UniProtKB/Swiss-Prot annotation:
Localisation: Cytoplasm
GO molecular-function terms, A-Z: ribosomal small subunit binding
GO cellular component: cytosol
Quaternary assembly: Monomer. Binds 30S ribosomal subunits, but not 50S ribosomal subunits or 70S ribosomes.
Family: Belongs to the RbfA family.
Function comment: One of several proteins that assist in the late maturation steps of the functional core of the 30S ribosomal subunit. Associates with free 30S ribosomal subunits (but not with 30S subunits that are part of 70S ribosomes or polysomes). Required for efficient processing of 16S rRNA. May interact with the 5'-terminal helix region of 16S rRNA.
Name of the gene: rbfA
Lineage of producing organism: Bacteria, Pseudomonadati, Thermodesulfobacteriota, Desulfuromonadia, Geobacterales
InterPro entries: KH_dom-like_a/b, RbfA, RbfA_dom_sf, Ribosome-bd_factorA_CS
GO biological process per UniProt: maturation of SSU-rRNA
Protein name (Swiss-Prot/TrEMBL): Ribosome-binding factor A
Entry keyword set: Cytoplasm, Ribosome biogenesis
Length: 118
């Protein structure tokens, strides 16, 4: 059974992903992927998780670009979802993909070491 906040999170995910592709013209926002959205039960706060291809500098630049676009994105969310109150949007870099890649790399190293010891 879905809660209303889950449905709103899904809708925000789709809307923000679409805005990043065609709605925002900020050059600081590079190749960004929205990986998830968590919305509080009262729908007052939404945390948007994203990843960026590129260096640490690109990640910082993208965060600055996203934070400067929060007002526009929030207005679009409110307008498209017809919410009485637009949720406060917080962008957070999603480190889970990098973490997963690091674990995978370590497991491969362990596997190759064990294979070499036979």
């Amino acid at each position: 059974m879905y809660k209303r906040s889950d449905k709103v999170a899904e809708a925000i995910h789709e809307l923000v992903s679409g805005l990043l592709v065609k709605g925002l013209k900020d050059p600081r926002i590079g190749f960004v992927t929205i990986t998830g959205v968590k919305v509080s039960d009262d729908i007052r706060h939404a945390t948007i998780y994203y990843t960026v291809m590129g260096s640490d500098e690109a990640k910082k630049s993208t965060l600055h670009g996203l934070n400067s676009s929060v007002g526009f994105i929030r207005k679009e969310v409110s307008k498209e979802l017809r919410l009485r109150f637009a949720p406060e949007l917080i962008f957070k870099y999603d480190e889970s993909i990098e973490y997963g890649n690091r674990i995978d790399q370590l497991l491969k190293e362990i596997g190759s070491e064990e294979g070499g010891n036979d």
